[in-house]
């Protein structure tokens, strides 16, 4: 019995403990769980409501999208139809424009091709003509015949004489021309009483005075003042040069400054001219005039074909002594013996270039040498050497044309093909076959 009571008390204690300490937490836990389940049920109900709402909204959006897409498609179809019509209209206009422009381009291209074809045919015709001419004149007899035909044409020009003035005169105005004539007459009177040595000394002193006047511009300007009384000019030249040059030179200088000169440089030109005349007088007395003329023209042609040498001789950055030294080296290396008078004339020319190109100054010197004998210089270029008869006929015809004896200076240029090229002073007569071919080519259309 006591055991039962003990068990009952133990059971009661256990029940008390369970009710006291276990049941409250379990109740709270169950209540919390129930609350959580209830909240979940509420959330599920809300989610179901939202799902229903979203489904409804989705359906509405789908319907609206279908309606909008149908509207956009309808508008796009309308726009596409309108654009298609516009493009079709523009394409028609563009096609007409392209067709018109293409037609113009075709016409322009046809014109250009026609012009180019004509030009090519023209050049080919000229080239073929040139070949025919070259083959024709390859025969020396036929080439000589071209010269004879040109001389026939030139002979027909003989009645029409041309007025050709001598060198230096063409550069001066009337007052200086008169002064040069008077001074030359005075020089001739003085020179006839001098021997060759005195003439050479006179030439050298005149060149020295000309160089001095070229440097002293103020003195030259005073000596050429166009005053009626020449006394002051004569006294000045005497004070400057008395005792420094010979009496003959001083006499010539007195005569020079007594004249009226149109330009300051004309006095220097006149002194240079007289210095050349003195040396040419020596050549004439020694019967060396032809040799002097030939060598001067030969040196002139050398400068024409060797422009580098002409540039060096006229390089004013180099002292005159250096340029004269170069000239002497060239003359010493010549294949022929250079006449001393030619060397002196060329040296004086280099010393008194005064801004002129060397090749022009030497050519002018050669013309002065020929003009001393009253001859006119004719520079003649031919494709081959002339026969004696042709040279004589050419000289005779040119002498009749210009009314003066003519000195023919011949130069060979095979590029001329045939005929002759004649230059007298500033007048040029071109009767070469090469010039005719060039003229034919120049007349071709561009």
UniProtKB/Swiss-Prot annotation:
A single MF term (Gene Ontology): proton-transporting ATP synthase activity, rotational mechanism
Keywords in alphabetical order: ATP synthesis, Cell membrane, CF(0), Hydrogen ion transport, Ion transport, Membrane, Multifunctional enzyme, Transmembrane, Transmembrane helix, Transport
Membrane topology: Single-pass membrane protein
Subcellular location: Cell membrane
Superkingdom of the organism of origin: Bacteria
Record region (ATP synthase subunit b): 1-168
Chain segments carrying region ATP synthase subunit delta: 169-446
CDD domains membership: ATP-synt_Fo_b
UniProt KW Transmembrane keyword: yes
Record-level GO cellular component terms: plasma membrane; proton-transporting ATP synthase complex
A Pfam family matched in the record: OSCP
Membrane spanning stretches: 4-24
Transmembrane found in the keyword field: yes
Subunit-structure text: F-type ATPases have 2 components, F(1) - the catalytic core - and F(0) - the membrane proton channel. F(1) has five subunits: alpha(3), beta(3), gamma(1), delta(1), epsilon(1). F(0) has three main subunits: a(1), b(2) and c(10-14). The alpha and beta chains form an alternating ring which encloses part of the gamma chain. F(1) is attached to F(0) by a central stalk formed by the gamma and epsilon chains, while a peripheral stalk is formed by the delta and b chains.
Task of the protein: F(1)F(0) ATP synthase produces ATP from ADP in the presence of a proton or sodium gradient. F-type ATPases consist of two structural domains, F(1) containing the extramembraneous catalytic core and F(0) containing the membrane proton channel, linked together by a central stalk and a peripheral stalk. During catalysis, ATP synthesis in the catalytic domain of F(1) is coupled via a rotary mechanism of the central stalk subunits to proton translocation.
Family: In the N-terminal section; belongs to the ATPase B chain family. In the C-terminal section; belongs to the ATPase delta chain family.
Protein name as catalogued: ATP synthase subunit b-delta
Organism field: Mycobacterium avium (strain 104)
Taxonomic path: Bacteria, Bacillati, Actinomycetota, Actinomycetes, Mycobacteriales
Gene: atpFH
